[in-house]
A protein has these predicted regions:
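Short, Lys/Arg-enriched N-terminal segments with co-localized hydrophobic residues
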Residues: 6-8, 12-22
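N-terminal binding-site loop/beta-alpha segment at the start of enzyme catalytic domains
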Residues: 19-98
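N-terminal small/glycine-rich loop or linker at the start of catalytic domains
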Residues: 30-48, 101-119, 148
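Short, well-ordered coil/turn segments that N-cap beta-strands
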Residues: 34-38, 67-69, 94-98, 141-145, ...
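Short, acidic/polar
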Residues: 51-63, 123-138, 185-192
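Beta/alpha (TIM)-barrel catalytic core signal, keyed to glycine-rich beta->alpha loops juxtaposed to Asp/Glu
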Residues: 152-344
Length: 347
């Protein structure tokens, strides 16, 4: 750990107060990296509306200043644009050890993966190699710290196609580790694949609503020293408390699909119920991150952040030992678990 001094906004229109914080780091599975408890999810840098490049650069630089060292992107985020943004960060922060994680898109362009699809249709060996080479170029690095499959079906666990490809990439030094980003609300759709010993990390949706990774996936990963990257900590934005029934997004923004009326209305009701009982003067975003932080299986979480104020607020959560998250508060969050099954809008 290291001491970090930075300023946060105590209240609207107040002066900046200086606080000395210690960014907390956790072990990243068998790779033995020390990664910041709060990482950086970069989907919103290229795949969502509302991001401006200069503001993006400032937010990324601020995160590094505050101790963030894990950055998750994907080729599919703007067809390499998000990877290019990360490449520029690596150049600007060349003196820092920053960990790069990206993802290989499915060849058939299906998110999530389709049950019964073949590995040859989704991740043939040459496709894995070709897109790793593209990402290496986009990122401007010789080695990708963590390459990941952007979708997955556990039925592919015994296929040699993907195994031979990642063994080749590791042997050639093109990647250090390999991970899987599991489909939404299918946290166990990877367990048999983990038995192969070839996967170093799992990226999974885990938040106050989506707690089911704790049932089977987390215990397995803890026992076998597999890193967990918790994604979608704010349920695509609902757990920030900023959405309402009239919320809209630009054409092409994923949230138009995810927050269709079928999902938005019950989500807002659950957010209201949660917000009405917030403990210890916590904000909803703070509670959301502290809930994820409480679980020892989680190596890092990757909220999306495009504003400096959000970077500062989120990094602050990664800089304490979470003593304020008591057993009583944990029991409170348990009441808000929401088990859901994949559907047409839950890509």
């Amino acid at each position: 750990v290291k001491l970090l001094t930075f300023s946060i906004l105590a209240a609207p229109h107040s002066t900046l107060l200086l606080k000395t914080l210690i960014m907390q780091y956790r072990n990243f599975g068998k790779l033995n990296w020390k990664v910041s408890e709060i990482g950086y999810g970069m989907w919103g840098m290229a795949g969502w509306s509302g991001g401006e490049d200069k503001e993006t650069e400032m937010a990324l630089d601020r995160s590094v200043e505050l101790g963030c060292n894990f950055f998750d992107t994907a080729y599919a985020y703007g067809a390499g644009k998000s990877e290019n943004i990360l490449a520029n960060l690596l150049k600007r922060q060349s003196g820092k050890r920053l960990y790069t994680a990206t993802k290989i898109p499915p060849k058939n362009h299906e998110w999530p993966s389709i049950k019964g699809s073949s590995i040859q249709d989704v991740f043939p060996a040459q496709h894995i190699i070709d897109y790793t080479e593209r990402s290496l170029k986009n990122l401007g690095v010789e080695t990708i710290d963590l390459q990941q499959f952007h979708v997955w079906e556990d039925a592919w666990s015994n296929e040699d196609e993907w195994k031979l490809a990642i063994e080749k990439l590791k042997k050639e030094g093109k990647i250090q580790g390999m991970g899987i980003s599991v489909n939404r609300w299918e946290p166990n759709n990877c367990i048999n694949t983990l038995h192969t010993g070839l996967i170093e990390s799992i990226q999974v949706i885990y938040n106050i609503f989506d707690q089911n990774p704790e049932d089977e996936l987390f215990p397995y990963c803890e026992k076998n020293n597999i890193a967990i990257i918790a994604r979608v900590p704010f349920d695509e934005g609902s757990l920030t408390g900023t959405l309402n029934a009239q919320s809209t997004w630009d054409k092409g923004d994923f949230r138009n699909l995810y927050f269709c009326e079928e999902n938005l209305i019950p989500t807002l009701e659950r957010v209201r119920n949660l917000s009405n009982e917030l403990p210890n003067n916590m904000t909803l975003p703070e509670l959301s991150l502290r809930f994820i932080k409480h679980h020892p299986a989680v190596s890092t979480m990757i909220p999306g952040m495009r504003k400096i104020r959000n970077v500062e607020n989120n990094m602050q959560i990664g800089s304490d030992k979470n003593e304020v998250f008591t057993e009583e508060i944990l029991a409170f969050t348990r009441k808000h678990r929401w088990d859901r099954l994949p559907t047409k809008w839950s890509h």
